[in-house]
A protein has these predicted regions:
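Conserved beta-strand hairpin/beta-sheet module of binuclear metal-dependent hydrolase folds
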Residues: 6-54, 173-187
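Acidic/histidine-rich helix-loop elements
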Residues: 16-21, 99, 104-106, 191-200
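Accessory terminal helices/loops
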Residues: 2-4, 103, 117-131, 209-218, ...
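Short loop/helix-cap segments at secondary-structure boundaries that form the rim of catalytic
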Residues: 6-7, 78-84, 154-155
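Active-site metal-binding motif and surrounding structural segment of the metallo-beta-lactamase
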Residues: 36, 47-93, 212-218
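Metallo-beta-lactamase
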Residues: 7, 37-38, 44-46, 98-235
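Hydrophobic/aromatic beta-strand patches that form the interior of the parallel beta-sheet core
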Residues: 13-15, 68, 88, 144, ...
Length: 247
């Protein structure tokens, strides 16, 4: 379990994902500049968010000014309430989270959802394990939204937020940090969630290709380790080779 931030570029850090499969604990990006802190995703629970906050304290970073949601999936947003900061997201993400926020979250509700939709059992069990205590839980709905693109300016850093959609989540955004040569791509090139996935679904090669840019050296997705541009490009090439080999 990660407990410390990893610096990936000047002023850019990562609270790394936990690779234990049933934890479903994704990466949380951290940008620190001019006395302000911006997070890329909120973590999968208030408990996860509290660990991120402790890691921020360890580098003497201020509490977050904003939290950017890369998409509306639970593991990226359920920590939002813990930071006391407004969230930024795509407008469709806001609509989705408004609906999710209206649900009666509890262990009983999770059990009822499993009965209604058995295909989602593993996801719902992971959700239950992550949150543990539902009594004071709430979903932080984004206050600031974009339709296609917006910029957030810190002291010396530009956050270029762009809606890219994709099969994994239609509300996915990527966050480019040109001065640091880092791009947060989150889950946008992943296949659909497990309960919606077909046998032929794989990584979105066209999405990967569209994000390749000589201006960026580090690519950070939602659940893996940071990759170089060449390593990120190789994901699409490997997918093509596997598809050709299966024909």
């Amino acid at each position: 379990m990660a407990e410390a931030l990893v610096q990936v570029a000047p002023q850019v850090y990562l609270y790394p994902a936990d690779d234990t499969p049933d934890r479903v604990q994704p990466n949380v990006g951290v940008l620190v500049a001019g006395g302000k802190t911006v997070l890329i995703d909120a973590g999968n629970s208030p408990r996860h968010a509290r660990r991120v906050a402790l890691a921020l304290d360890a580098i003497q970073a201020n509490p977050p000014t904003y939290v950017i949601y890369t998409h509306s999936h639970w593991d990226h947003v359920f920590g939002g309430q813990a930071y006391g900061a407004p969230a930024i997201a795509h407008e469709q993400c806001r609509r989705t989270l408004m609906e999710m926020a209206s649900r009666p979250w509890s262990n009983l509700y999770i059990q009822e959802e499993i009965q209604r939709n058995p295909a989602r059992e593993s996801t719902l069990r992971a959700m239950q394990k992550a949150v543990e205590e539902w009594r004071h839980f709430r979903i932080l709905v984004p206050e600031i939204t974009l339709s296609k693109r917006m910029h957030v300016f810190l002291d010396g850093l530009t956050l270029d937020i762009e809606h890219v959609g994709g099969a994994h989540a239609a509300d996915s955004v990527v966050v480019r940090v040109p001065e640091a040569r880092v791009i947060f791509v989150s889950d946008c090139y992943y296949p659909p969630p497990m309960h919606l996935r077909k046998p032929e679904d794989g990584l979105d090669k066209a999405m990967i290709d569209s994000l390749l840019d000589d201006a960026y050296d580090v690519y950070i997705d939602g659940h893996g380790k940071p990759r170089t541009r060449d390593e990120f490009a190789a994901l699409a090439e490997n997918e093509r080779m596997q598809m050709n080999g299966s024909r």
